[in-house]
């Protein structure tokens, strides 16, 4: 188990394919898109990471639990918390849905469970063999979905 808070990051480069028509042939290749590049805190060992974190949230903790669960927690000046969690296929989690508004939506073509309560909003879905979750303090449904939809594979 590793847990620490650090402001150091590494930059994830994002590329877009280009195609240029030259008449008899079309050249294709990759071009770096610096506008889409984003930072990932050092110590993050998961395969996925959100490219969008709401303004004002700063990393307070990065954890690796037995190589099965990867967590990163953020906090803003209002003491509101945001957590992104990635679990391997060998891990399992429970979501408190008692007295919650629960519905299903789609994220990246996968079914996502959304649970909204007065004190907690959770969005959980899978990407390949990983279960991903975004957890927000309070009824932060719109922000939680925006963070979830921004998650991309980085490894």
Stretches found by the model and what they are:
Residues 29-30, 155:
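Intrinsically disordered, low-complexity repeat and linker tracts
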Residues 1, 5, 112, 148-152:
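Long alpha-helical scaffolds
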Residues 128-155:
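Surface-exposed amphipathic alpha-helical segments
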């Amino acid at each position: 188990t590793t847990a620490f808070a650090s402001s150091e990051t590494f930059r994830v480069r994002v590329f877009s394919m280009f195609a240029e028509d030259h008449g008899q042939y079309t050249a294709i290749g990759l071009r770096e898109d610096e506008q889409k590049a984003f930072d990932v805190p050092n110590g993050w060992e998961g395969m996925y990471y959100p490219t969008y974190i709401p303004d004002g949230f700063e990393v307070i903790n990065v954890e690796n639990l037995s190589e099965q669960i990867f967590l990163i927690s953020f906090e803003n000046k209002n003491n509101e918390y945001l957590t992104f969690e990635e679990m391997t296929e060998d891990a399992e989690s429970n979501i408190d849905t008692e007295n919650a508004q629960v519905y299903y939506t789609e994220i990246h073509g996968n079914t996502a469970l959304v649970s909204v309560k007065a004190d907690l909003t959770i969005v959980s879905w899978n990407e390949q063999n990983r279960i991903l979750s975004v957890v927000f303090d309070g009824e932060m449904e719109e922000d939680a979905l925006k963070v979830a939809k921004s998650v991309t594979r980085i490894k």
